[in-house]
Amino acid sequence: MELHNIRDEYTKRVLSQHDCHENPISQFEQWQKEAIHAQVNEPTAMNIATVDEQGRPNSRMVLLKEVNEQGFVFFTNYLSRKGGCIEHNPYVALTFFWPELERQVRIEGKAVKIPAEQSDKYFATRPYTSRIGAWASEQSAVISNYKSLLAKAALVAAKHPLNVPRPDYWGGYLVVPETVEFWQGRPSRLHDRIRYRKESDNWIRERLSP
């Protein structure tokens, strides 16, 4: 299957280094708000890449649940494959892609577990069925069939008909950024790339060649 004729010309926006915020968190928050306002499909979806003990990379999509001055927060099963990778090597890479805006954001940094009480607080806001699912799913483990998963979920629901506590193996990670790159598509593949990199306690902002 040949795909070399599938291409778009990027013409919608410009990213000026002069107009960027002094720190990447503020710049990201601005772009995130614009993605939500533009009704981008899944504006909080991000790819997270990790490396296992053999040095082999793997990636998957997760949802961003919070941005604060420290970094980017997502939640998962700590016993999942991604959790095991992070336990072995906490350095991860995040990528957001908003095609409707011809934009991409790449983040590299260290993932650290957030305090249990913060995970408890978020877990309590999840729909009941999602909380049941956190108990029923041994994420990344091989299962015999889908019916067995539903059966386990039913057992959990019977045990917790009202309040579902957070499993100890489920919680949040904070990705503390070391570099953040904002990419804006431009004509002729001469794209805008503005990178922020942490140096001591300061953010250095620089333009990269596309």
From Swiss-Prot:
One of its GO terms (biological process) is pyridoxine biosynthetic process. Its EC number is 1.4.3.5. Gene3D superfamilies: Electron Transport, Fmn-binding Protein, Chain A. Binds 1 FMN per subunit. FMN binds at residues 60-65, 75-76, 81-82, 104, 139-140, 183, 193. InterPro entries: Pyridox_Oxase (IPR000659), Pyridox_Oxase_CS (IPR019740), Pyridox_Oxase_N (IPR011576), Pyridoxamine_oxidase_dimer_C (IPR019576), Split_barrel_FMN-bd (IPR012349). The keyword Ribonucleoprotein does not apply. Keywords: Flavoprotein, FMN, Oxidoreductase, Pyridoxine biosynthesis. Pathway: Cofactor metabolism; pyridoxal 5'-phosphate salvage; pyridoxal 5'-phosphate from pyridoxamine 5'-phosphate: step 1/1; Cofactor metabolism; pyridoxal 5'-phosphate salvage; pyridoxal 5'-phosphate from pyridoxine 5'-phosphate: step 1/1. It catalyses: pyridoxamine 5'-phosphate + O2 + H2O = pyridoxal 5'-phosphate + H2O2 + NH4(+); pyridoxine 5'-phosphate + O2 = pyridoxal 5'-phosphate + H2O2. Substrate binds at R7, D8, E9, Y10, K65, Y122, R126, S130, R189, L190, H191. Homodimer. Catalyzes the oxidation of either pyridoxine 5'-phosphate (PNP) or pyridoxamine 5'-phosphate (PMP) into pyridoxal 5'-phosphate (PLP). This is Pyridoxine/pyridoxamine 5'-phosphate oxidase.
